[in-house]
Amino acid sequence: MAINAQEISALIKKQIENFQPNFDVTETGVVTYIGDGIARARGLDNAMSGELLEFSNGVFGMAQNLESNDVGIIILGDFYTIREGDEVKRTGKIMEVPVGEALIGRVVNPLGQPIDGLGDIKTTATRPVEAPAPGVMQRKSVSEPLQTGLKAVDALVPIGRGQRELIIGDRQTGKTSVAIDAILNQKGQDVICIYVAIGQKESTVRTQVESLRKHGALDYTIVVTASASQPSPLLYIAPYAGVAMAEEFMYNGKHVLIVYDDLSKQAVAYRELSLLLRRPPGREAYPGDVFYLHSRLLERSAKLSDDLGGGSITALPIIQTQAGDISAYIATNVISITDGQIFLQENLFNSGIRPAIDAGSSVSRVGGSAQIKAMKKVAGTLRLDLASYRELEAFTQFGSDLDAATQAKLNRGRRTVEVLKQPLHKPLPVEKQVLILYALTHGFLDSVPVDQILDFEEALYDYFDSHHEDIFETIRSTKDLPEEAVLNEAIQAFKDQSEYK
């Protein structure tokens, strides 16, 4: 058999031309230490800060400390199956979470994976967990109210869309209840809500989710949870994952309300990670950048300019204090970043004043400009009246004789405190809040016994619902009060036909 050299040569040339090198270049390193949610790896010389790294068991980590001889990694998942000597490789990506409408109504972990047993989340859109906050020219001043449905908040410390309002207080003072009520009140307001539970007991989160479901609020709410049993890296990352989901809606011109419950636990988780990564401790053993931890998170809440669609993220961060000390390190940090705070006091809570808002220490730095005209008119002097009542109340404990004017102030003050009380999970529409506050400030409640104020309030709403729905409609549509004579006549007519004469 004759061998044709030219044919063989042509065949070899063809094979060389068609040769496809089938190999993948990845930079890999070796795990040198593993434990407590962090790892150290050698050999990842070109890793970037915040880059996602993949371990041989499929779990991801995030590069945090870039040192001369190794890389400190926080592990975003189960670290129990990782061993010293395992391979870890660079991905060239930063951490992203799934975002979009498909997440609404779901309970997810900080990685965006569903944990509610309702199947996969069908979305292809993702956003980076760490993103720059909108710049000065991309923002617009807060001008629209975000009604919480709580009389004490909407009248005394109003919140506007795009504001950051801190809820601060000791444990068991109703901080979460204020935030959940604010979420419940967004029903039908075209606001998407995100509740981020950080370091909570799983039973507590379950209770909150059931409460949201029962009131129909899950239809517009996403729950992101990193429970107390999860590793610190997930607690640290949870708020950033929540705000990344919120940004998707904000940049599409929608309004979002996000609750961080609570940032004290996130700071503790970050302290734990930093100490394990051998970063130098500062005050109370927190790392030096603990202020930046919260400032870069809360600065991502904004009211966008009209050019960018006018969307907004309103943030309600929660901080837990000890023995009412609002001058603690993390508390003062977050107070200085936010646009005001709602301070809840244990002694008010225990004496039955709920929500237990301390009007003297609570403030809203920007929300006043977002209040509707009607609320501004009826709540204008409320804060001062309440403050002078507290002062007089302390003074009267000495038992001195009081003149008629002082007695009248005390009587009005007691009724004000009573009117600002509200049952749990029963937010009020703004027109009803305006009505009862108008009745209070114009003396219609002065003759009603203090212990009957709440009954009077319910009866007044029922009467106006059936006889004067037009007045409610006027407040809703014009955002202003109807003529005083009309309102006075309607309230007086109710009093005349009721037992509260």
From Swiss-Prot:
Can you tell me which family this protein belongs to? Belongs to the ATPase alpha/beta chains family.
UniProt lineage:
Bacteria, Bacillati, Bacillota, Bacilli, Lactobacillales
Its EC number(s): 7.1.2.2
List the membrane topology term(s).
Answer: Peripheral membrane protein
The UniProt site entry described as Required for activity is assigned to 362
Q: Which organism is it from?
A: Streptococcus thermophilus (strain ATCC BAA-250 / LMG 18311)
Annotated protein name in UniProt: ATP synthase subunit alpha
Where's it mainly located?
membrane
Q: Its gene?
A: atpA
Q: What does the function comment of this entry state?
A: Produces ATP from ADP in the presence of a proton gradient across the membrane. The alpha chain is a regulatory subunit.
